[in-house]
From Swiss-Prot:
Involved in the modulation of the specificity of the ClpAP-mediated ATP-dependent protein degradation. NCBIfam families: PRK00033.1-2, PRK00033.1-5. This is ATP-dependent Clp protease adapter protein ClpS. Pfam families: ClpS (PF02617). HAMAP family: ClpS. InterPro entries: ClpS (IPR022935), ClpS_core (IPR003769), Ribosomal_bL12_C/ClpS-like (IPR014719). The gene is clpS. SUPFAM superfamilies: ClpS-like. GO terms for biological process: protein catabolic process; proteolysis. It comes from Ruegeria sp. (strain TM1040). Residues 1-26 are annotated as: Disordered. Belongs to the ClpS family. Binds to the N-terminal domain of the chaperone ClpA.
Length: 113
């Protein structure tokens, strides 16, 4: 006598047993990102702003010059978008460097949308 495998439900119309169990993984949320902004002032030389952009944000001269012009014309520019810790560090580095060179350059961060 041949034995049939034992099934959870031998009734084909019974949908209470869906068969496979799946484990749902919780979705990992990405950490919030922060924009680092440079603000225009009437005293910081344009070339100093270019140096800051090259030194602390790794931009080439042309990229740094473009952002410096945006800061000059529009009053501010987004320099980059980073994790909170990186943005905070960059703001502190720029502000410290500007102070040490006696420039009033302002750098801030805000949460990216």
């Amino acid at each position: 006598m041949l034995m049939q495998p034992l099934m959870m439900s031998d009734n084909p119309d019974d949908e209470s047993d869906l068969g496979l169990l799946t484990k749902t993984r919780p979705r990992t949320q990405r950490p919030p990102r922060y924009k680092v902004l440079l603000l225009n002032d009437d005293y910081t030389p344009m070339e100093f702003v270019v140096i800051v952009l090259e030194r602390f944000f790794g931009l080439n001269h042309a990229q740094a010059f473009e952002i410096m012009l945006t800061v000059h014309k529009k009053g501010l520019a987004v320099v980059g978008v980073f994790s909170h810790e990186v943005a905070e560090t960059k703001v502190a580095q720029v502000m410290d460097y500007a102070r040490r060179h006696q420039h009033p350059l302002q750098c801030t961060m805000e949460k990216d949308d």
